[in-house]
Amino acid sequence: MKFQFVTALALASTMAVAAPINDQQEVLGAVAATRSKREGGSTGAELQDNNQPTAGLFGDGNSFGNQGLGGFLAATVDSLTKTIASPIKGILAPGGGSGGNGGSGGSGAAGGVGNLFSGILGGL
């Protein structure tokens, strides 16, 4: 007798829990009025529009398309890092570049000065 009661109770609770699932899907469909762009199939132009770079205070920043204050701050840090790193890369870069090679003997001092100026001017 006890086994039958437990079985009947388990069956009843399963039916009670399973019944609202179909109703929940209808409710969720009514509640979720907004649709994701990807849900209906996006065009390439929409995806590109979502992926525009965020400009920072010092020019181009990150390329993730973050918007709002957080995105602006991230882009500003990124653009500041690029602004500082550009002249340093120019100074440390090997080779003559615009400073000349000093003939066939290698870069020499003239090449280093050329890297210095091209690095500084390239960062501006």
From Swiss-Prot:
Keywords assigned: Cell membrane, Glycoprotein, GPI-anchor, Lipoprotein, Membrane, Signal
Domain of life (superkingdom): Eukaryota
Locate the region Disordered: 38-59
Tell me what turns on expression of this protein. Up-regulated upon milbemycins A3 oxim derivative (A3Ox) treatment.
- Gene Ontology CC terms, in alphabetical order: plasma membrane; side of membrane
The protein's topology relative to the membrane is:
Lipid-anchor; GPI-anchor
* Subcellular location, principal: membrane
Entry keyword annotation includes Transit peptide: no
Record's signal peptide: 1-18
Q: What protein name does the entry list?
A: Predicted GPI-anchored protein 11
Q: Which gene encodes it?
A: PGA11
